[in-house]
Amino acid sequence: MTTDEEIIIRLYQEMYSSMINKDRAELERIHDDSFVLFHITGMKQSKNEYISAIMDGTLNYYSAVHGDMEVAVNGDTARLTGKSKVTAAVFGGGKQTWRLQLDFELIRKNGEWYFTFAKASTY
């Protein structure tokens, strides 16, 4: 049996694969419609804005090597802090590798976990 923690970690890994592969359907599936992302700069994006930025090349992801991941589940909500070395070119900048930390909130609906909130920082 797979634990909620394992499912959430796998979801985090799937998210990065979907960002790299520009897989709109998977990105739509794993992010709740209420999803909001706060970038390192403080810029806020809704689910639709975020996915559109990946699809149109505003946010380009090339690889991600995952490090520490901490998950805390509380009933049908959870928090995940994931640390990954991410190679990306974003907002017209050059390709570089970032030590990116994402702090997530998730919700479980009908037995499935979805990202509802993310805040990016570096570590």
Model-derived regions: residue spans:
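A beta-strand edge to alpha-helix "cap/lid" segment located at domain peripheries
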Residues: 2, 6-29, 34-123
